[in-house]
């Protein structure tokens, strides 16, 4: 079964809100987000030396434990290990209020005129903690070493800028159908925990981090929608006909999530393939996009090695906060 379909079914089976991360911390452990990160940044000592680890945890761990690890579905982040017995750092980008909220609207309500109103509650948030949850982050790989406290401060000054330009958590890369042309054209990029991690690798490399010797590039999840209709079209939400079409689409998608309770995996898969061959809608950065998915290969979910930075470093490309009050 396609991994995304399996995840959607899992979301439908569970009736409670699902957090994308495990947020239970002991006393003395503090969390900082992009709007108050300076409080944490100013506690880091310039002379400290850090190692950077790429860490992963099974997706929806708080609800399913290690189950989704079996299909290589992970939440990812970065751990900065302090070699001078100073504070360790964990930083990740996650979906709030839940992973489910990235796929389904908060509410779809029909008014007295028979028209729908759709409400979303989904965002992407960077969180920094002075703690490493060894139980939760059960996979790790050394990526860089010899990062100074000064470089870590500079990195933490970059993170709020990233979050302000990536306020929505978006699961999908949207690309042209490979069967139509020899090369794929990317129309929309995803904005996920993995995307944040790889952006962090790039920034920390430019700041002077030394790449560790690894046998292969680290692996990451990647979900792609392949479309045959050309560039996705922004839908006019104020057009009641279009809005009702969007509402019907997401109601159907939610119904598919609930099918896992009384249908076989093969039945669900076949129905979803038929569904995906029609028009598809995505909610990205506060806009609705309409597209026609490829009949041959509408969607892919991969877990493959992805390159880490090499070559020339350009420190001046990094946008960051100039100072912290």
From Swiss-Prot:
An annotated GO cellular component: lysosomal membrane
Molecular function GO labels: hydrolase activity, acting on glycosyl bonds
UniProt keyword list: Glycoprotein, Signal
Biological process terms in GO annotation: lysosome organization
Glycosylation site residues: 88, 117, 133, 163, 182, 189, 238, 262
Domain of life where this protein originates: Eukaryota
Residues spanning the signal sequence: 1-19
Pfam families per UniProt: CLN5
Family statement drawn from the similarity comment of this UniProt entry: Belongs to the CLN5 family.
Protein name in the entry: Cln5-like protein 2
Record lineage: Eukaryota, Amoebozoa, Evosea, Eumycetozoa, Dictyostelia
Gene designation per UniProt: cln5lb
């Amino acid at each position: 079964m396609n991994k995304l379909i399996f995840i959607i079914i899992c979301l439908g089976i569970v009736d409670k809100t699902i957090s994308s991360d495990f947020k239970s911390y002991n006393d003395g452990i503090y969390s900082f987000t992009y709007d108050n990160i300076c409080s944490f940044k100013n506690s880091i000592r310039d002379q400290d030396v850090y190692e950077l680890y790429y860490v992963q945890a099974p997706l929806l761990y708080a609800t399913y434990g290690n189950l989704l690890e079996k299909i290589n579905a992970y939440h990812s982040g970065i751990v900065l290990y302090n070699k001078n017995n100073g504070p360790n750092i964990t930083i990740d980008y996650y979906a709030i209020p839940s992973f489910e909220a990235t796929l389904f609207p908060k509410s779809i309500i029909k008014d007295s005129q028979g028209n729908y109103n759709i409400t979303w509650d989904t965002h992407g948030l960077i969180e920094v903690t002075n703690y490493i949850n060894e139980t939760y982050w059960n996979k790790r790989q050394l990526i860089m070493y010899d990062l100074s406290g000064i470089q870590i401060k500079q990195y933490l000054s970059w993170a709020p800028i990233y979050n302000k330009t990536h306020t929505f958590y978006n699961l999908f890369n949207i690309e042209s159908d490979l069967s139509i042309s020899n090369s794929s054209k990317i129309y929309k990029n995803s904005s996920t925990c993995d995307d944040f991690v790889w952006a962090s690798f790039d920034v920390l490399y430019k700041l002077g981090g030394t790449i560790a010797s690894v046998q292969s590039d680290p692996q990451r999840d990647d979900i792609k929608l392949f479309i045959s209709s050309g560039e996705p079209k922004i839908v006019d939400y104020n057009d009641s006909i279009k809005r009702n079409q969007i509402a019907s689409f997401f109601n159907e998608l939610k119904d598919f999530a609930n099918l896992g309770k009384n249908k076989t995996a093969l039945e669900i898969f076949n129905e979803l393939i038929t569904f995906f061959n029609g028009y598809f809608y995505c909610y990205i950065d506060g806009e609705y996009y309409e597209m026609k998915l490829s009949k041959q290969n509408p969607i892919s979910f991969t877990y493959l090695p992805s390159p880490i930075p090499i070559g020339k470093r350009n420190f001046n490309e990094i946008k960051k906060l100039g100072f912290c009050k």
